[in-house]
From Swiss-Prot:
<comment type="function">
    <text>This is one of the proteins that bind and probably mediate the attachment of the 5S RNA into the large ribosomal subunit, where it forms part of the central protuberance.</text>
</comment>
<dbReference type="GO" id="GO:0022625">
    <property type="term" value="C:cytosolic large ribosomal subunit"/>
</dbReference>
<dbReference type="GO" id="GO:0006412">
    <property type="term" value="P:translation"/>
</dbReference>
<keyword id="KW-0687">Ribonucleoprotein</keyword>
<dbReference type="Pfam" id="PF00861">
    <property type="entry name" value="Ribosomal_L18p"/>
</dbReference>
<keyword id="KW-0699">rRNA-binding</keyword>
<protein>
    <recommendedName>
        <fullName>Large ribosomal subunit protein uL18</fullName>
    </recommendedName>
</protein>
<dbReference type="GO" id="GO:0003735">
    <property type="term" value="F:structural constituent of ribosome"/>
</dbReference>
<dbReference type="InterPro" id="IPR004389">
    <property type="entry name" value="Ribosomal_uL18_bac-type"/>
</dbReference>
<keyword id="KW-0694">RNA-binding</keyword>
<dbReference type="GO" id="GO:0008097">
    <property type="term" value="F:5S rRNA binding"/>
</dbReference>
<dbReference type="InterPro" id="IPR005484">
    <property type="entry name" value="Ribosomal_uL18_bac/euk"/>
</dbReference>
<comment type="similarity">
    <text>Belongs to the universal ribosomal protein uL18 family.</text>
</comment>
<comment type="subunit">
    <text>Part of the 50S ribosomal subunit; part of the 5S rRNA/L5/L18/L25 subcomplex. Contacts the 5S and 23S rRNAs.</text>
</comment>
<keyword id="KW-0689">Ribosomal protein</keyword>
Length: 116
């Protein structure tokens, strides 16, 4: 495994341990060059309460690997999380830098009503 990926996974592990200690519901984000995924996971880590990604039929028709798509996923995850009764989450960026698509998703989720 290359050094860049190892560093990302180390950061992700540290973040997840901190969130688990808080006992908070988390908004977990993962990205690939082509898609972006978001899940709201319960505080015990055992249940996915809401999910959204660029693979959803409503978002799949457009481009899927850019900031615009991440903004749409952020708005969709906020809507689905609120429908599941979740308004406050801890943001788990999975070790990715808070920049670009990750930042766009987080900003859209905040505008949609989620509290970080």
């Amino acid at each position: 495994m290359n050094e860049k990926k190892q560093s990302r996974l180390r950061r992700a592990k540290s973040t997840r341990l901190h969130i688990r200690a808080l006992g908070a519901t988390r908004l977990c984000v993962n990205r690939t060059p082509r898609h972006i995924y978001a899940q709201v996971i319960s505080a015990d880590g055992g249940k996915v309460l809401a999910q959204a990604s660029t693979l959803d039929t409503s978002l799949r028709s457009g481009t899927t690997g850019n900031v615009e798509a991440a903004t749409k996923v952020g708005a969709l995850i906020a809507e689905r999380a609120k429908a599941a009764g979740v308004t406050k989450v801890a943001f788990d960026r999975s070790g990715f830098k808070y920049h670009g698509r990750i930042k766009a998703l987080a900003d859209a989720a905040r505008e949609g009503g989620l509290e970080f």
